[in-house]
């Protein structure tokens, strides 16, 4: 069974009422290799790891970065995507880099790496939202000073808003991987084998080109 949060282009989002995206296609390939039935349901990002621990889901394929804290509660597959964190501000903002975020009001998606990074900035007031479009809407409405988001969703969603820009320098590098229940080593082995096969036979590159126009 597979559940994903909805609203993180190009990884998972709704189009004509259907859940689509890079992670959805990746989950389909994995299910096909495992001979399993794929079930995709909407789930908030911060609820994914508790759902794994509780046995309500088997895999979390949701643009999730591997962190030391998350590894305490879940097993992670081989990485399938290299991401960075980006700062987005209004075009007329006086914030030019990470140090400019000190003491500012920062919007983030709840439970993400951006949420963690923002909480480490001195004096910052962190405002959490359930999905990327919500975060950018708050910025466009001048209710936060800046937002921190993963690079791919930031690039995809910012086009729907006027007057916003992504600052030039990334503020962190990380790997996306599939999360599984901490004790499920047999499943991890199968998922790793599938990811490695996809990298070797060109299927992973094909997915990257489909959603990003390039390989990574």
Cite the ranges covered by each PLM segment.
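Ligand-binding clefts/hinges and TM-proximal coupling segments of bilobed small-molecule sensing domains
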Residues: 113-130, 162-170, 195-216
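Extracytoplasmic small-molecule ligand-binding "clamshell" domains
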Residues: 1-63
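A ligand-binding cleft/hinge motif common to bilobed small-molecule-binding domains
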Residues: 47, 64-72, 117, 140, ...
